């Protein structure tokens, strides 16, 4: 009698493929088998081609580290469990036309794998599923959530349509360095480092549905990117590294939330000896009113000790007694004290401050003139001029 090089198990009518011990390069799973057990083919270095026949479910790590496996036919498979084909470094072709669920890291580090089209039957997908693959185009516009690290490290990916997704998980496209187009028009949340080090991707517009942007979500953004009013949560360096200059447009109603992007603690008021510690400027903010009209311009700074508070914004708009401690340091660019004086200011420049009443605008102007004049006289008397 012929000795079989595999083991089957009958579990109440379900035929489960338990373990393969053969050395063939090509193998077809016997008819009637509907499940592949956990690690059934794992670490097989000879297998190159496999036909799963009637299999509906592929167990966890079933083919993990089958480093010479090149093609997999599984037209009836509905469930591919976690790590099923992880580290199959030679795998380039799979047929997944009926799949409904793919588990975490199922195809992670399949560095030659390119799936031309994802089946619309797919309703659930795990974290890191296609991380470090060679997929060039991803169209999964029906999924509402893009899981963590889904395509991270896929340097071949150039186009992604995730236009139905409400949630984009952290590092979902991190280090997809060739990605140039990503459609995410329904997104409400973009996770930390979602597009981190996507050097070719510069979003020109963010969706009106967006509410939060995580830390370091984008590597860079298009000049004058408009930040929607809906966004209330901004992560640290969410528009790119702190050492890279950016320019965005922000609505007045979002300015308080936006300020938290730069600063940690908000003072309730200014004291005479209050100091604000500033470093290199990193972002230019054009302020818009509800009709998209520009009302102000703020070059903001990283590493501020304090942030713009609601009380401060209210004072901008109405309070004539507010002490406008803002200095246009560019008025006297030749004075070396300019750089040192930045410890006393929040913003380098504020043009057309927020619909001030005429008296308040005059007070603001007089304050700037008198304060700068005192500083200039002090600099001259101390011979502190370039």
Question: What annotation goes with each model-predicted range?
Answer:
Residues 344-364:
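Repeat-mediated protein-protein interaction surfaces in helical alpha-solenoids
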